[in-house]
Amino acid sequence: LSEVKGISEQKAREIARQMAEKSEMRSAMMFLQQYGISVALGVKIYARYGSGLYSVLKENPYRLAEDIQGVGFKIADEIAGRIGIHTDSDYRIKSGLLYVLSLAAGDGHVFLPRSILLARASELLGVEASLMEKHVMDLAMDRKVILKEMDFGDRREPAVYGSAFYYLELNTARMLKDLDVSSSQPEEAIRKRLDFIEKKNQLTLEELQRQAVIEAVNHGVLVITGGPGTGKTTTINAIIQYFELEGLDIYLAAPTGRAAKRMTEATGYEASTIHRLLELSGLVEDSSAGAHFERNQDNPLEADVIIIDEMSMVDISLMDALLSAVQVGTRLILVGDVNQLPSVGPGNVLKDIIDS
């Protein structure tokens, strides 16, 4: 090519390199298609591994499930079967165990009791549960799962967490503890202000509702729970008016647009979704999977009081993102009913907070 007029030696080398790369990629696509892999997926695999894809597929095709978006356990297992990987392969069993945990997360669970995990994996993989106990330990050694002893009714055994969910739970608990800063405003002064709010709004607060306001004033974190008709909305309104009289900045939010609209209608104050409150960037609201929030520990919310309604619908990932954006000194009030709609994502956050 360098002999062709107008093509320098450097340009000729670049053209030759590109042609060789295209030839190599074409060969890789033909190789992958033997195992039922589409061209689109093949391009992703080649982009990730290059010419190393041959050794990856030969040694451990289950790496695809971890490394390539769009390749789950099922596809990797199908490829492994075509290549001739044994059904009791260590790679297959460990990948299958992680897949069972991911299915549980899709159903809202951040962990499974080990016996349940092994039983489900046995059904999926066709391998005896007892033969897979060592693989659970191997995953724990690799920090891909975390084991935590727990009581499950009449038995005690390890709960098996995917590592990410374990640390989300741990981090959430730590941040809630840090936020729960007590103050000591005199109860008599709080009650006098509540008398003023009652008179102004021509309402009568029950003693339990007054106590909730007192707790909100004197604690960094408060949970208000109860079924429909138990006075949660009246209590929230009293809390809002109390802090408004103190000149504090109050933010209201809920997990979904519909819940935020109901909160606005019930209180008369503007509420947003949690995603909008945290300034979701680049993704659709009501889906926190992989979301990037502009509000975080480096750019926290500038609020004195944050009230979150419909907490039963908040999953562990969204809760972690919310707490990361709340400064110590901000009062956080969580409102909800554990018997209402659960979160779509993993983690029964409201119930766990109440139980703790």
Place the predicted regions along the sequence by residue.
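Conserved ATP-binding/catalytic motifs of P-loop helicase motor domains
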Residues: 1-356
